Amino acid sequence: MADTARGIQRLYLTLTLLTTLAASFIWGVNTLFLLDAGLDNTQAFAANAFFTLGMVIFEVPTGVVADTRGRRFSFLLGTVSLLLSTVAYWWMWLSRAPFWGWAVVSVLIGLGFTFFSGATEAWVVDALAASGFSGNLETLFG
C-alpha cells in the first residue's frame, strides 16, 4: 500500500509540475501577445492580474464542483471554459478589442484553470484514501 500511495503522490506532483510548466510557457509570452493586441503596458499587466483574480475567486467553488459533481465533469467544464476563452482571446486579438474585454476573458481563463486544479486535488485525495494512505495531506499540498 505504501508503494501505491507513493506512486499516486508522484503522479499528482508530476501532473502539477507539467500543468505549471505549460502555464509558465503560456504566460511567459502572454504579455507580448497583449501588447501586440494593442494594449499598453499597464493594461497588459492588469489583464494578467485579472487572470490571477479569477483563479483566486474560483478556486474553492470549482473544487466544490469536483467534489460534488465529479472530477470528470470538472475536467470537462475546465476544457470547455479554456476552449471558449481561448477562442475569445484570439478573436479579441484579431479585432483589437478594448481593455475591459481582455479583463473579462482573463478572469474566465482563470476560471478554466481552477476547474483542473480542483479536479486534480479531488482525485489525489480519493486515490490516496482508496490506497489506505494514513499520512498527512499537508505534506502533499504544502
Tell what function each PLM region has.
Residues 2-57:
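Helix-loop boundary and gating motifs at the non-cytosolic
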Residues 8-16, 75, 102, 140-141:
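Hydrophobic alpha-helix/TM-entry signal in multi-pass membrane transporters
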Residues 15-16, 20, 52, 99-110:
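Helical-face signature of the major facilitator-like transporter fold
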Residues 37, 67-68, 95:
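Membrane-helix boundary and inter-helical linker elements of multi-pass secondary transporters
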Residues 58-71:
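Helix-to-loop junctions at the C-terminal end of transmembrane segments
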Residues 68-79, 133:
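Cytoplasmic membrane-interface "Motif A"-like loop-to-helix N-cap segments
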Residues 76, 80-97, 102:
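C-terminal ends and interior cores of transmembrane alpha-helices
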Residues 107-142:
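Cytoplasmic helix-loop-helix junction between adjacent transmembrane helices
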